[in-house]
Amino acid sequence: MGVQLRLPPGEPCHEGYVLSLVCSNSSRASCEITNVSESLPYPVVYTNLNSSKTNFSISASVENKYNLYVGLVLAISSSVFIGSSFILKKKGLLQLADKGITRAGQGGHSYLKEWLWWAGLLSMGAGEAANFAAYAFAPATLVTPLGALSVLISAILSSYFLNERLNIHGKIGCILSVLGSTVMVIHAPQEGEVTSLHEMEMKLRDPGFVSFAVIISVISLVLILIVAPKKGQTNILVYIAICSLIGAFSVSSVKGLGIAIKELLERKPVYKDPLFFILLTMLALSVTTQINYLNKALDTFNTSLVTPIYYVFFTSMVVTCSAILFQEWYGMKAGDIIGTLSGFFTIINGIFLLHAFKNTNITWSELMSTAKKEALSPNGNQNSYVLLENADFSASGYDDDITLFSRTNDQSSHKL
């Protein structure tokens, strides 16, 4: 609910009644009452429609900030639960492997008897539920990029509980991801967006979003029917592009269903609205398609490449779809837009460092020793000696070179 109004005594309040409001710019607005429900205990009540003060904007700002904070807490909680779930399930699977039981990768199902695996599954469910609820309170522009924190949390916990080494690139990537997420939270849009299924329906009918949906659908069909059978096994971008394009619809559906659940808690007959079932069907189709092609990408290409590329493509499509559908960027200051984009690209760099160099064994002490060696040679001459000291020369290789040159000389002498 964006703005609350208390009508004067005797003023009718029923569906279909039209209110005439006087705006601050001397214009008039006609508002039709589309739904009547029980009053909720909001702390601010508006009693004067003609007040010259900015009560409307103040209350809307307070409510929007409240929703933003709730969505932020839910999004971070989702990342914590999902990141922890990978560790719990992996820990349970490792315990089964130590016992000599058939592993899941070999077709075994003994993990169903392991309580740690079930704890991980419940943690995953709690994280997905929190993420689902976060879209009902906060903009998708904020919720979706924060999903990168689950990767960060999983990487940190794995180094402590699974004894998996986190190199210097991974640590820098974690720091960049946290900094980028913080910047995005600070500059996130705080508009009220859509607060009811009726408003959601109006947004979906907007010509701009209809054009966007048609273009995305056509591109997705071309990729699925024509490009994927030919180039899917050789080009990593094909499967990831399909997942990302379809993923934009899944997030929009989740956003709409979250609003429907909020209205259902307010005892509104949401189940009578066809849009509820349309969103539910769209979510099922889009998620099924995403899972199918994401599994193909993971099965065909290296995970260290799929994860960061998929994050960039998917988040970019969600932000674009949200900007068109919910107009989350409308009214944002230039500084906030730059800050949001900067935070997003910082997260991208962090995720890239975390995955692309995860097999690179470089420690902080090695970097410091290299820096000290470089500092010893002001003219850069010491570097050549360091290279010579670290180079491995084999006697056999040296002999091969001599033999090669001698054969060359012999051949040249015969020619002469």
UniProtKB/Swiss-Prot annotation:
KW Lipid metabolism (keyword) present: no
Highest rank taxon of the organism: Eukaryota
Keyword Chloroplast tagged: no
GO BP terms in the entry: magnesium ion transport
Catalytic function, reaction form: Mg(2+)(in) = Mg(2+)(out)
Chief subcellular location: Golgi
SUPFAM superfamilies per UniProt: Multidrug resistance efflux transporter EmrE
Tissue and organ expression note: Expressed in the pancreatic islets.
Keywords, sorted A to Z: Glycoprotein, Golgi apparatus, Ion transport, Magnesium, Membrane, Transmembrane, Transmembrane helix, Transport
A molecular function GO annotation: magnesium ion transmembrane transporter activity
Pfam families, A to Z: Mg_trans_NIPA
Cellular component, GO, one term: Golgi apparatus
Annotated localization: Golgi apparatus membrane
Induction: Up-regulated by low magnesium ion levels.
Membrane topology of this protein: Multi-pass membrane protein
Side Extracellular, residues: 1-67, 136, 187-207, 255-273, 327-336
Side Cytoplasmic, residues: 89-114, 158-165, 229-233, 295-305, 358-416
Glycosylation sites: N25, N35, N50, N55
Database matches in InterPro entries: Mg_trans_NIPA
Transmembrane segments: 68-88, 115-135, 137-157, 166-186, 208-228, 234-254, 274-294, 306-326, 337-357
UniProt function note: Acts as a Mg(2+) transporter. Can also transport other divalent cations such as Fe(2+), Sr(2+), Ba(2+), Mn(2+), Cu(2+) and Co(2+) but to a much less extent than Mg(2+). Shown to promote insulin content and secretion in Min6-K8 cells, particularly under conditions of hypomagnesemia.
Protein family per UniProt: Belongs to the NIPA family.
Listed PANTHER family: MAGNESIUM TRANSPORTER NIPA3, PTHR12570
Protein name: Magnesium transporter NIPA3
Lineage per the UniProt record: Eukaryota, Metazoa, Chordata, Craniata, Vertebrata
